């Protein structure tokens, strides 16, 4: 074998050198980005735990480790956390995994995929638009059960269409139901910040704990991964929806009691405000001593 064979551009080894060089560059860049992102992620977790008011509890005595377990002991924490996990899991599966699976099938074309995504997006937009008036009127547990019911209904319709190949039903029914369920599952936990002052501090602790434990490079939540490892629960999103629906029914009595106490407290605040305004108009109360306007707990989307 002559020396010209190694210098020939048609030789396989000479062709493989640029590929190996580009592969090394790609691996180096990826490793650099991973190191930087990991450092930033750890730094953000440290700052969240040290400086944010949600995790920095105003205390006089020393830190008690039992305070860190307060969100875990609360049933509402698990209820709304699983609700949010089911909603975000459905969102990522529908918009990231479903298009690739549908385009890989011979009977599915791109003309069917576009209306499917379009109808689901429209359903999510309209549902999120009216959540601000629906949640204060019906209550968070009722809206939560409705959203989980929509997710389960979408799963049943998808199973029916897979068996009988009813593509039009899948486009116009299951996607709309899934979109409504996703928007509801994401909106209801966020409404806790404005729905009740009794749950405000607990919601902040739960959100901070969830943000500190979540991984930004994972699209699937830890609960979905844990449920998938159980074996029979292959479709984890609908399993989470069923669990949330059951938990919401269990906490129905407790939620109704808390809502009654909250309504009584809110009525008392409104009564004090009206009384102070009437005294101010009569000149019997100075403006500085007038009670402030009571807080309204209606949830509004940006």
From Swiss-Prot:
One of its GO terms (cellular component) is plasma membrane. Keywords: Antibiotic resistance, Cell membrane, Membrane, Plasmid. InterPro entries: MFS_trans_sf. Its main location: membrane. Disulfide bonds: none annotated. It is found in: Cell membrane. GO terms for biological process: response to antibiotic. This protein is thought to be a membrane-associated barrier of drug uptake. This is Chloramphenicol resistance protein. The lineage of its organism: Bacteria, Pseudomonadati, Pseudomonadota, Gammaproteobacteria, Enterobacterales.
